[in-house]
Structures are given as structure tokens and as C-alpha cells.
Amino acid sequence: MIALATGVDLVEIARFENLNPKIKERFLKRVFTPAELKESNGSMQHLAGKFAAKEAAAKALGCGIGKVNWRHLEILKSEDGKPVLSLHEQAMFMAEMHGWTSWSVSISHTQTLAMATVTALVEPPGAQR
């Protein structure tokens, strides 16, 4: 049976704006890929959105962030500006294990909040169409 897996997350942008300067750089490098950091160009609003998308992806995978490395979930923009979720290493393994065949991500912001949803089409091996 074909199904959907969905994850949603909401992040306060102030959490990123108010990061302790002593840990900020280490935290950002642990959570985001070099490409994500470059693309965000220091925008805490954009980084909060990417963070929410990573959390939403982990929830859709059914494992939470503890089972996958932050940097194995990469959120970058397509040429037309849409966010794209790329899965690497353990995250890709988990997606394949759960039967993910395609997925999408959506990110939205207000002045204070960043929200993301990830939806995946799940087709377990041997599923009937």
C-alpha cells in the first residue's frame, strides 16, 4: 500500500539570533553543510527554516534527529528558489529502508517563527499500486 510520511517542525528564529557567540560557529558547522551556510549568507531566518526542515525530515523518517546526522539532511534552493531536501549517508539509508520514493519540503517564515513540512511518498517493497 502506498502511503505518505509527513513531518512538521516550528522554530523560534530568536533561538538562532541569540546563540551564544562562544558556541555559535561550532553549532552552525555541526548542523549545517558548507553549502547551506554559504547559501544562507548569515541569515538566521534562513538557517532557522533549514533547521526546521531538517527536524521535519527526521520526523517523517520516523526516527527523530538522534538516528541521523544533521548534515546528512541538506536543504538547498533549486534554481527557481524552492527548497530541496537532499538525503545523504544514514538519512538516505533510512529513507530507502522505509520505502521513500520521492519527497518534498516546504518552508515558511514570519518575523519570529520558521516552519517546515516534509512529505514523502512511501512505497514499501512489493506494494500494490
Please report, for each region that a protein language model flagged, where it lies by residue.
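Core catalytic alpha/beta fold that binds nucleotide/phospho-ligands
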Residues: 1-129
